[in-house]
Amino acid sequence: GLFGTISYSSMDERFTASLGLRADANNYSSAMKSLSDQLSPRISLSYQLAEHWFVSGNAGLYYQLPPYTALGFKDNNGTYVNKYNLRYMKVSQESLGISWRKGDTFEVSVEGFYKDYDKIPLSVVDGIPLTCKGNDYGVIGNELLTSTAQGRSYGAEILVKWLIAKKLNLASSFTIFKSEYRNDKESEYIASAWDNRYIFNLRGTYNLPYQWSVGMKVSCIGGAPYTPYDEEKSSLVSAWDAQGKAYYDYSKYNKERLPAFAQVDLRIDKTFYLKHCMLGFYLDLQNITASKLKQQDVLMSTGIIENPEAPADSQHYKMKRLKQSSGTLLPTLGITFEY
């Protein structure tokens, strides 16, 4: 690969620009060996409109290899079955923002962004873009794939920073977005596994007298979409015995959504400045509200056949659901030492 960049700043430093160009290639297949097919230009601009006011924007084209598990997948004959199906994944992104700054003590900014994804690997078996397979799938990519899926994500972010020297350090951000994928150009967009819709973060530290300080972090994220199980198919004895786990109902892919999750962390520090060193003690309380992050229930077979008198291909297991959630108060006591 090759990479180059050039930067410019005006004499009064009100305008800055950066240009870059990257090219990638490899010898995995004939479709990936040409540098000219994976040229990635990018540009970043910033301009001071007036006192305290700044506008900035950037645009770029990026290429990335599919997962190595996909590139290295072989069939029973030892053939790299994805060799002629996969291409570099292509991502183009643009953003534009405006900010108001008062020195280094206060800043408010608003930024909008748009990302377009192309040549994303698609699972031939499941008919799902590889990037949409969430944490439930374990290792992904070791299957037959084709680079036909597309995606997009877009949204806006508000960022606030406030600093009072030796007293307060506060930062907050709120992002709203949508993340969608489709199998090909003719398909409709559907929510990706990461389409949480919003993320909120607030963190701050306040310095008290006598070298005490208190910090807090508040995090909140919208619920992720998920695909419900096909209970009828999953309960079939022949189907369950074939793979030992439930089947998803892909006709309702990512149509359901989990609850939102919020967490509050608290930290208290006490510092002692000695002659040649600094000694500190802290109490860190993560998730002080003991909030629970809920996941999709697991559909399991009880091993009991509900209709043993039925023909073998029509017998069904009695099923049960196991709740999945995590989250507990996690206290930590610590010591810091600097010499």
Task: Report residues per predicted region.
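Residues that define the transmembrane beta-barrel architecture of outer-membrane proteins
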Residues: 35-39, 90-94, 150-154, 196-200, ...
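Residues on the lipid-exposed face of transmembrane beta-strands in outer-membrane beta-barrel proteins
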Residues: 2-8, 43-47, 96-100, 156-162, ...
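Surface-exposed extracellular loop regions of Gram-negative outer-membrane beta-barrel proteins
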Residues: 52-94, 114-139, 143, 217-243, ...
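C-terminal beta-signal and adjacent terminal beta-strands/loops
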Residues: 118, 170, 220-243, 259-263, ...
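Extracytoplasmic loops and strand-loop junctions of Gram-negative outer membrane beta-barrel proteins
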Residues: 23-28, 75-83, 91-92, 137-145, ...
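Structural signature of Gram-negative outer-membrane beta-barrels, strongest in the C-terminal barrel
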Residues: 1-118, 173, 199, 205
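Outer-membrane beta-barrel channels and translocator barrels
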Residues: 11-13, 48-52, 91, 101-105, ...
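Gram-negative outer-membrane beta-barrel transporters
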Residues: 9-11, 15-17, 114-116, 135-228
